[in-house]
Curated annotation (Swiss-Prot):
Superkingdom: Archaea
Organism: Archaeoglobus fulgidus (strain ATCC 49558 / DSM 4304 / JCM 9628 / NBRC 100126 / VC-16)
Name by which UniProt lists this protein: Uncharacterized protein AF_2094
Chain coiled-coil ranges: none
InterPro entries: DUF5749
Length: 90
């Protein structure tokens, strides 16, 4: 089941938007922050919306920061070449 690009609600309240799945976590953009919400806290998924229950928000913020750092690392030329980029001019 695809959980990306869906509105996330905590109970009846709008919470954020899902942008990635990171292991056992759903990455949710909440304002300017990224939270790693445990997938086990998902209560339902239907009609383009995800409803979540309670979870440790401080831990979710910390894991969200780690996710952002990992996703923001620069890519080396060798990594680009391993994916087939940069070989056109050679």
């Amino acid at each position: 089941m695809d959980l990306i690009c869906m509105y996330v609600f905590k109970g009846e309240e709008s919470f954020g938007e899902s942008i990635d799945v990171y292991g056992d976590y759903l990455i949710v953009k909440v304002g300017t922050e990224f939270l790693a919400v445990p997938k086990k806290s998902i209560k339902s998924v239907e009609d383009g919306r995800i409803v979540i229950g309670e979870f440790d928000e401080e831990e979710a913020r910390e894991l969200g920061r780690k996710w952002l750092e990992e996703k923001s690392k620069p890519v080396t030329l060798e990594e680009l070449k391993s994916y087939g980029f940069g070989e056109e001019g050679e």
